[in-house]
Amino acid sequence: MLNIELNDLIKQIITTQAKSQTIEVKAAHGGTPKRLYDTLSSFSNQDDGGIIVFGLDETQNFKPVGVYDLQDLQKKVTEQCNQMIPQIRAIFTIIEYEGVNICSAEIPSIDITNRPCYYAGAGKVKGSYVRVGDADLPMTDYEIYNFESFKSHVHDDERPIDRATLSLLRENDINNFILQMKLNRPGFSKLSENQIYELLSITRNNIPTLASVLNFGIYPQGLLPQLAITAIVVPGETIGDITSDGIRFLDKKRIEGTLSEMLDEAIAFCKRNIKVQTIINPNNGKREDRTEYPINAIREAILNALIHRDYSIYTEGTPIQICFFTNRLEIHSPGSLYGRMTIFDLGKARPDLRNPALATMSEFLLKTENRYSGIPTIRREMKEYNLPEPVFENKRNEFVVTLYNNQHTSNNNEDIDLIRFCKSPKSRKEIAEYLDIKTTSFVTKEYIQPLVDAGKLKLTIPDKPKSKNQKYYSD
C-alpha cells in the first residue's frame, strides 16, 4: 500500500465512521492488541483479504491516537501472524497523520486450497473465522467442511446411502440410462453390469449412491426426507405478510419425487402462480400471451438448484425453497458456491463441479446441456422480457436467485426519501436495508446509480466508484 493510499483510507474511515468487510481498526495506543487471530483468520479466508489499521480509536469516533511503538507493533503482529496455519505474511505501511503515527497491516487472501486459515492455538474447528460485515464470526462446521471437501475432491452426490438397496430403484429407468450411455460411449459395452454401476456412480461398493436414489429411486424422500422442494406464494413482499382474511400463503406445496419429477412439478407450480398478460408483439403486430416471468429462466434456476445444491450431511435436512412474493420470485438453494466460483464469475468462468455424477446423469435424464449455460440463459431471458437483471446472492449457507417482476420499480417518492436518508454517508448495505430490499447489487443498479448519474447522490470515494468501502451522501 502506498502512503497516499493509506492517507486516503484513514480519511475514508473517519468520514464514514465505520469499519467494513475488508477494513478493521485497532487503537494500539497502549500496546499491541493481544487477540488479532480472529481478524487474521477471517481476512485470509476471503478472496479480497483485508487491512488492519492501527492508531485510530473506534471508541472516540475513530480519532487518530497513534500507535505506542511502531517497531514493537510490527514485531508482535508478525508473531501473531506466525501462529496461524498457514502462516500469514502481513505487509506493513507507516505514515504520519495529524501528528501521530498510523500503521496498516495488509492481510493477503490465501489460496482456497489452503483454507481455512486458523489460529494454531485453538485448532481448526475453534480457530477458523469468517468476515461478515465488520465482524469476525466463527466458521460453522459446514463452512469448514466446504473447504475441506473441495481440497479432498469429495463429491457428496457419490456417497452411498446406507439404507438404500437396488430393489428400491427403478430398474427400467436404470437400464434405459445405461443403454443411452452405451450408445454414446461404445467402450461401456465391454464392461460388466457391476463395473458400469460403479463407473456411473449408480452404486459405490454395491450400495446405491445419493445420485442414483435421487434419479432412479421409487420414492427418494423415503430415504432422504428433506431432499425435496417447498414452494409458497406470499401475499406481500416479505414473509409474514397476510391478506385481509388473515391468509399467510396463497398457495403452498411440498414437492417430492426424483429430480426429473420435482423439476416438472415445480415448474407446474410456478406456472399456476404467475400472472399472464396479453401483449402486442412489436415485430409482427400479433397478440401474444406473456407470463410474468420467463418460464425458461425459472426452469434454469430450479434446475441449477437441483443439480448444484450442496448434498452433504450438513445440508441434507434443508429442502430447496421457491418463494413467490408480489414483486419477485426467490429460489433458495442449500449450500454456498463451490470451489473457486464467485458471484462475479457466474456464467463467465468454468465452475468446479460439486456434483459430477448428478451433472452427468442430468444430461440424459433432465435433457440438460451440462455446458454451464444456465446463468447466461437466465440473464438473457430476463433481458428479453424487459425485466430487471436477475440477482444472485452467495450467503454463508445458501445460494439465492431472485427474479424481479415489473412491479418492482423505483418511484419519485422513494427517490426523495432515499436522498433524505443519505444526508449522512450510507453504504450500499445500509441503503438496501432502508429500502427493505435484500440484494445490494439490485439496489445499486436500480436506485443508487440513477441518483448518482443525476447528481443527487455523491460518492465518498469518487476515484474508486466500485470500492467495497464506498458510501453515498446527498448535499
Feature locations, PLM:
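Conserved N-terminal catalytic/coupling substructures associated with nucleotide/phosphate chemistry
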Residues: M1-A297, I302-Q407, K426-S427, K456-L459, ...
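Short amphipathic alpha-helical interaction segments
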Residues: Y293, I437-D453, K466
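N-terminal positioning helix adjacent to the helix-turn-helix/winged-helix DNA-binding module
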Residues: R354, S410-E414, V443, Y447
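Short alpha-helical segments that sit at the start of domains
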Residues: N405-F421, D463-S467
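A carboxyl-terminal module marker
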Residues: I416-I419, L435, K445
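Short acidic, hydrophobic short linear motifs in intrinsically disordered regions
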Residues: S424-D436
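Charged, terminal alpha-helix-loop-beta segments
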Residues: E430-E433, K445, K458-L459
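Short, cationic-aromatic polyanion-contact patches
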Residues: T460-D475
